[in-house]
Design a protein with these regions (language model features):
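Inward-facing hydrophobic residues that define packing positions of alpha-helical scaffold repeats
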Residues: 8, 23, 35, 42-43, ...
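TPR/TPR-like (Sel1-like) alpha-helical repeat modules
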Residues: 47, 60-82
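Solenoid-like repeat scaffolds
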Residues: 9-16, 40-49, 76-80
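Terminal, low-structured helical/coil segments at or just beyond the last alpha-helical repeat
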Residues: 84-100
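Solenoid-repeat scaffolds in large eukaryotic assemblies
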Residues: 37-38, 68
Length: 100
């Protein structure tokens, strides 16, 4: 799989890296500033823990904290106390990890 720095830098291209999971695609679109497209990616995969985690991040990013809390619970995670940037990095690192 691609390294975190290469994944983050790939937002200058037209599409997420080939083989990216829906959750990674959502993070990629979010990094590009296309919240709606990112949301579509995760919404299409509700119930998948990785997508639910990114879904929570997206609603936190938009400032809808009650909706974010719902998605954190669905993902089985506590509400993040990290900055949005740190949470994006943590999620991307986890999703890009060698165990995936």
């Amino acid at each position: 799989m691609i390294a975190l720095d290469a994944f983050a830098a790939s937002v200058t291209t037209d599409q997420p890296p080939a083989g990216s999971s829906p959750a990674l695609q959502a993070l990629w679109w979010a990094r590009r500033g296309d919240w709606a497209r990112a949301h579509e990616c995760v919404q299409a995969h509700e119930g998948e823990p990785d997508c639910d985690s990114v879904h929570a991040h997206l609603h936190r990013e938009e400032g809808d904290l009650s909706n974010a809390g719902y998605w954190y619970r669905r993902a089985g995670r506590p509400v993040s106390q990290q900055s949005l940037e740190a949470e994006w990095t943590a999620l991307a690192t986890e999703l890009l990890g060698p165990s995936r």
